[in-house]
Amino acid sequence: MINKIYGKVIEKKESSLVLMTAVFEFELLVSAFCLANFKLLDKVELFTYLYTKENELKLFGFLNSDERETFKSLIGVSGIGPRAALRVLSNIRYNEFKDAIDREDIELIAKIKGIGKKMAGKMFLHLQGKLLINNELESSLFRFKELEESIVSMGFDRKIVNSKLKEAFNLVEFSNLKDSEKEQFLFKEVLKRMSN
């Protein structure tokens, strides 16, 4: 199984990213949140899921393992295929989806185009208590809270700073750095992205 792909974004389509690796180009179907996270020529790391059915092979890409696990849980629900699962994750973030399931907020899920109340109820019955997320991104954000505060104190909007930090966390350059180098990289990368 292909667990992760490291590559450079060479094309962005309506619902997919094309990544150039050392040898191959891969097109990965991704959520709207994942798509919005990256720009052309960004070097990225995506978790993957290879969907196989009869003569159909599709490669899906995810920001982290939690988003991938949520996708896999969704396609385990009868009547939910990979496209519908991706539509869910394009309308609501994986952690918000888990919260909605835990809170029994069927109305929120039912509002997603193509889902409706009946399917939302089926999701709730199938998934309640089964969605576990590792909060990798959240724990990383907490670790660099002081950095976020220092950038906000420069006059930047907190929500935008938070969003740019999340983008930087998913860059290959960040994951390859020593811990001692990560804060300086994030500071420079976030400021660069804020000015674009």
Curated annotation (Swiss-Prot):
Species annotation? Borreliella afzelii (strain PKo) (Borrelia afzelii)
Query: What GO cellular-component annotations does this UniProt entry give?
Result: cytoplasm; Holliday junction resolvase complex
Any Pfam family hit: HHH_5
> Where in the cell?
Cytoplasm
Which InterPro entries does the record cross-reference, listed alphabetically?
DNA_helicase_Holl-junc_RuvA_I, Hlx-hairpin-Hlx_DNA-bd_motif, NA-bd_OB-fold, RuvA, RuvA_2-like
Q: Tell me, what is one Gene Ontology molecular-function annotation carried by this entry? A: four-way junction helicase activity
Per UniProt, the keywords (alphabetical) are:
Cytoplasm, DNA damage, DNA recombination, DNA repair, DNA-binding
User: What are the boundaries of the region Flexible linker?
Assistant: 139
Q: From the UniProt entry, list the residue stretches annotated as the region Domain III.
A: 139-196
The entry's free-text remark on domains says:
Has three domains with a flexible linker between the domains II and III and assumes an 'L' shape. Domain III is highly mobile and contacts RuvB.
- Quote the function comment for this protein: The RuvA-RuvB-RuvC complex processes Holliday junction (HJ) DNA during genetic recombination and DNA repair, while the RuvA-RuvB complex plays an important role in the rescue of blocked DNA replication forks via replication fork reversal (RFR). RuvA specifically binds to HJ cruciform DNA, conferring on it an open structure. The RuvB hexamer acts as an ATP-dependent pump, pulling dsDNA into and through the RuvAB complex. HJ branch migration allows RuvC to scan DNA until it finds its consensus sequence, where it cleaves and resolves the cruciform DNA.
Q: What's a BP term from Gene Ontology annotated to this protein?
A: DNA repair
Region Domain I, as annotated, extends over 1-63
Family statement drawn from the similarity comment of this UniProt entry: Belongs to the RuvA family.
Signal sequence bounds: none
Name the gene: ruvA
Name by which UniProt lists this protein: Holliday junction branch migration complex subunit RuvA
Q: How does it assemble?
A: Homotetramer. Forms an RuvA(8)-RuvB(12)-Holliday junction (HJ) complex. HJ DNA is sandwiched between 2 RuvA tetramers; dsDNA enters through RuvA and exits via RuvB. An RuvB hexamer assembles on each DNA strand where it exits the tetramer. Each RuvB hexamer is contacted by two RuvA subunits (via domain III) on 2 adjacent RuvB subunits; this complex drives branch migration. In the full resolvosome a probable DNA-RuvA(4)-RuvB(12)-RuvC(2) complex forms which resolves the HJ.
Q: Which HAMAP family match?
A: DNA_HJ_migration_RuvA
